């Protein structure tokens, strides 16, 4: 199997792996993608689809190349966007035949091989008034699955837009007639549907709208500022990830990943630095590493930092934050942490390698005597006793006592002038 180790976004550079729909299947990330076949062209040429997987979001393995010849389509240049789902131990692959039809294939493994489930389109362009392409599949909390598809009225004419329908348990037929989604925005194609904090998020090209019902109506909120093309979201290891399109060229695109944070008002926030450099690895030369950029979080929640800006990572019991592949550590001599401690005392352990790895240092925190929330913010630091390897996983083990909320804001590594000698 082909493997690629990414240094930054895009995660699979120079290969035309685009229109990413990302899923957490069996505690592993799977990227279901279209494939721009030819660089330096002035139109889309897409001969197949690709499925990539990763256990750390940095090292990616090509699971399979899916060819339209294996389905009802036959040879094609129009292998447009795809999505996938898991139900009852089987995996379902929904694919676009250009902007005209949608098919479905099934496999016993998330990486395939996939077999055409119907031998004909699931949507042949006649069931609704919209253009039936760009499928997005969504699993709700009650175990029901829905398919969203369609292109915008401003492009394809009256009656077009997003449509949604609940799927039967077989995942290859509809349990109801697709209905049009009401959206107070112009919309697009390239839909994705997720649920965060009890709200349904319909997203498209970085834009997103929110509803209390899976069927809508959806109220436009804003843009993630991470991409203007296909994207999708998934939750994994206590973190929210967005798979984004990175435009290396207009018709030869790539895919990247970034973290996503949700404000109290429902806005989705991304970080420009992470949009550029990607997830799962960090540079100790950065001025600060935000706590919410963790790759894995146990017993934590993100909350808005009302005193300053951005987000905090909060816990009220033992918690663990993991920041793997921290680079350029060999010339660093110390560690500095910004945090809040409210209600009592806490201990923050900084370790390498894992939760039980070597201890770099420890910070003892306690609720300050100041009466204003602003002054609950503290900074503390310590010097390393040993020289660090140049690349290492760094883990924060948080131990608040009962009745204490510990919030981590950010941290950075110290490089003293003497280390340059």
Please annotate each region the language model reported.
Residues 1-421:
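Carbohydrate-active catalytic/glycan-binding domains of CAZyme proteins
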């Amino acid at each position: 199997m082909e493997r690629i180790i990414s240094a930054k976004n895009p995660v699979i550079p120079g290969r035309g792996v685009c229109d990413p729909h990302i899923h957490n299947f069996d505690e592993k990330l799977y990227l279901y993608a279209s494939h721009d076949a030819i660089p330096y062209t002035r139109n889309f040429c897409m001969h197949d689809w690709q499925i990539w997987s990763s256990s750390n979001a940095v090292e990616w393995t090509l699971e399979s190349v899916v060819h339209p010849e294996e389905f009802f389509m036959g040879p094609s240049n129009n292998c447009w966007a795809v999505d996938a789902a898991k139900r009852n131990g089987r995996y379902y692959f929904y694919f676009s035949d250009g902007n005209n039809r949608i098919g479905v294939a099934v496999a016993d493994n998330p990486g395939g091989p996939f077999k055409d489930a119907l031998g004909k389109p699931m949507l042949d362009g006649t069931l609704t008034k919209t253009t039936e392409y760009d499928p997005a599949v969504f699993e709700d909390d009650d175990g029901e699955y829905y398919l969203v598809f369609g292109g915008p009225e401003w492009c394809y004419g009256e009656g077009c837009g997003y449509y949604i329908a609940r799927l039967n348990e077989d995942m290859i037929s509809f349990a109801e007639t697709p209905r049009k989604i009401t959206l107070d925005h112009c919309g697009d194609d390239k839909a994705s549907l997720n649920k965060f904090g009890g709200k349904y998020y319909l997203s498209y090209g970085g834009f997103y709208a929110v509803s209390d019902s899976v069927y809508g109506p959806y109220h436009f909120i804003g843009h993630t500022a991470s991409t203007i093309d296909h994207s999708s979201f998934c939750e994994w290891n206590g973190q929210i990830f967005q798979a984004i399109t990175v435009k290396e060229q207009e018709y030869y695109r790539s895919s990247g990943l970034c973290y996503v944070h949700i404000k109290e008002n429902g806005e989705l926030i991304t970080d420009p630095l992470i949009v550029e450099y990607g997830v799962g690895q960090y540079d100790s030369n950065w001025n600060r590493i935000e706590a919410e950029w963790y790759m894995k979080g146990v017993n934590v929640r993100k909350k808005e930092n009302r005193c300053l800006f951005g987000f905090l990572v909060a816990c009220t019991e033992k918690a663990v934050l993991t920041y793997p592949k921290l680079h350029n550590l060999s010339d660093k001599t110390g560690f500095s942490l910004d945090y809040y401690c409210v209600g009592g005392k806490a201990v923050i352990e900084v370790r390498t390698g894992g939760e039980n790895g070597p201890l770099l240092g420890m910070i003892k925190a306690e609720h300050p005597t100041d009466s204003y929330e602003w002054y609950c913010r503290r900074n503390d630091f310590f010097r390393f006793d040993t020289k660090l390897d140049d690349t290492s996983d760094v883990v924060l083990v948080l131990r608040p006592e009962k009745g204490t909320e510990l919030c981590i804001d950010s941290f950075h590594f110290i490089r003293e002038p003497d280390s340059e000698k």
